[in-house]
Amino acid sequence: MAVNGAQYIFGEFSPDEFNQFFVTPRCSVELPPYNETVSCGIKSTNEEYQRIEFGVNEVIETESSVLNNTDYSISSTLNPQAPEFILSCAPAQKTPDETNYNSIDCQFSDPTLTLDSGSNAENDGLSGGLGQRERKKKKKRPPGYYSYLEDVSDGVAPTEALVNGHANSSGLNSIGTEDTELTGDIPSLATPRTCNSPDNSVDFVHEAVSDDSVSSALDNTRTAGQPEVCRVTNSEQFCIPSETGRDSPLRTAVVQPYAGTDTTESLGVTNGQTLESSGEDTAANGVELHTVESTDSDQAKPEEASPTTEATATVAGSVPVNQPAKSWASLFHNSKPSASTSVVYVETKYTPPATSTLVPEKQVEVKEGPVPVSEDPVAIKIAELLENVKLVHKPVSLQPRGLINKGNWCYINATLQALVACPPMYHLMKSIPMYSKSQRPCTSTPMIDSFVRLMNEFTNMPVPPKAKQALGDKIVRDIRPGAAFEPTYIYRLLTVIKSSLSEKGRQEDAEEYLGFILNGLHEEMLTLKKLLSPHNEKLSVSNGPEVQTVREEEEQDEQGEGSEDEWEQVGPRNKSSVTRQADFVQTPITDIFGGHIRSVVYQQSSKESATLQPFFTLQLDIQSDKIRTVQDALESLVARESVQGYTTKTKQEVEISRRVTLEELPPVLVLHLKRFVYEKTGGCQKLIKNIEYPVDLEISKELLSPGVKSKIFKGQRTYRLFAVVYHHGNSATGDHYTTDVFQIGLNGWLRIDDQAVKVINQYQVVKPSAERTAYLLYYRRVDLL
């Protein structure tokens, strides 16, 4: 090809296009003379382009080289303004003490390599210098042009290498004539190479030839998603492939060791990203990391590193499209910048292998359900506290607060308000310390923890003196309720403890939820109590009588009738069995709400059999038309009733009757008016009838068991109402619950409907209403007020 005319090799261009695209030469890198450490070339031929890689891992014989000049340079092939398109560029002289080189850019032309060189980076005043080139007026650039000089200030040449018109990390560093010779060959990894190039671009990477010619090549197809970083040190070259693609993350490349070389730079590879030093002051200034990464691929995390210098790295990502161009002219006219080719720079911190860059964070195992008490270090402290706790029945004045209801939690909110108004319950929970999640990540008592937290949501108010209690209504109106809150930790107990109340489609019942709370608290306290006495067998039974064996029955029969604490039970084959009263395990919950009823069964020609049953709520049947008041329901409870259809083993029908009496009265008596009647068909109907209930309730002696009538005084069987839970609606489904509570600090009553709190008079509490019916009645013993 002639070199004296204004000829170009990649298509036909008009003079305007020539002046626009190819008028400015570019700075290039000069390599040392070929008679010392020079490059070895590998040419790869494909259908649409030729590819030549170069390195410095062999010494080229003088007679076999195609390079005839001692000073030469190889320039880029991608940038349309690069000087390889102009065939008449004069080579520049090499500076002897030059240590940094800009780029390795080469072209392949028929039959020999065209060696072009511009001025060095230091020669800013020359026509080929980058400084002069940057100061020129910006002209209209072709669509595919990549601006790689935007970050360079005036008069200063870039220090990074430029490959295909873009900043690249594979520049030559510290190559001089004083470099040592290689004692061994470093095999070049024949992986296609790609740089940060625009779409529809073709990459030509050449190497200096070795031995006969540049005809020895590896047939490797260029892939847009598989970049290869080529690096040259004083006496070696590393070609490290780093594979990136749309569907695969960066892979870790292995640097092959070499022997007999003396390098002054540290090299590192981490996940296909090559760390290279930028000059002699690498330890001081750091190392730059350049990689081509697809924007759609996952972010690669460094796993290995070889350099010992901590560095700040920059990662550039782009998504080149692998579409071969028909000609360079069509490439310049038709290529359009893609929106996916934007370069993003991410500042990352590189650390040496002594300290791992990825420290796996230890995940704390969070258990949804309660843990055993043996795994809870706080359990023993709570157990000791509950063992020595003394119930406080002193009335407490609390600032009222509503409860936010974002679901169907009205039956829970109504029950919670009644329990907060119960002084012994409030004082009990306030005596237990409240632990944070950091202090107690796993708990064996979720029910206790939740109610301790609930009671701490309410603050005390000063109790007005008796002189002002006469003006109770005025005092109440001067008190403002606190802010409403949502007790989500209480709602969560239904799923944590896996109660049947959490089953989908189950009837939401305030009385059933109250039993769920009280039984749950009792069981947790029983477990804590067992922690203090692990060898006590009685604690393994929550509540219930112990049945004696037949031998014990015979011994008891020989001793006589027995004491008042004994009870009889009909065992198998209708044989009478005598059993002592069970030793019930007491907890603070049973000390507040727990009572006992005595159920006696009468049968002809047989001894009476009695059973003691504990209760938290006393169930009152109000279905009969004769029952109009709570007193009527209590008398109906203890009335003797006959049991029909009972037959013996001889198929003879026997008349049996049963009677229930109150054996023990609790400090807090909860009466359940059974308004829901379940039919044989499976349906449920609500009994809409008014049941009168007094503020002060006296349990008559006729309701008590014969053995305790003389032991319980009048003050111990007289109760005062302090809370009422109402059920709204005429059906069992789609119901709503509200609560009226007595506030001692206000000396009056409050009506709480979820988050709404208002003051009412006492007659409104006991007055019958068509829109609501009393469902649960909370009474306190007057001797404990």
UniProtKB/Swiss-Prot annotation:
Residues 305-314 have a biased composition (Low complexity). The keyword Nucleus applies. GO terms for biological process: autophagy; cellular response to interleukin-1; DNA damage response; DNA damage response, signal transduction by p53 class mediator; DNA repair; negative regulation of canonical NF-kappaB signal transduction; negative regulation of stress granule assembly; protein deubiquitination. It is an enzyme of class 3 (hydrolase). Coiled coil: none annotated. It catalyses: Thiol-dependent hydrolysis of ester, thioester, amide, peptide and isopeptide bonds formed by the C-terminal Gly of ubiquitin (a 76-residue protein attached to proteins as an intracellular targeting signal). Gene3D superfamilies: Cysteine proteinases. Belongs to the peptidase C19 family. USP10 subfamily. PANTHER family: UBIQUITIN CARBOXYL-TERMINAL HYDROLASE, UBIQUITIN CARBOXYL-TERMINAL HYDROLASE 10. This is Ubiquitin carboxyl-terminal hydrolase 10. The lineage of its organism: Eukaryota, Metazoa, Chordata, Craniata, Vertebrata. The gene is USP10.
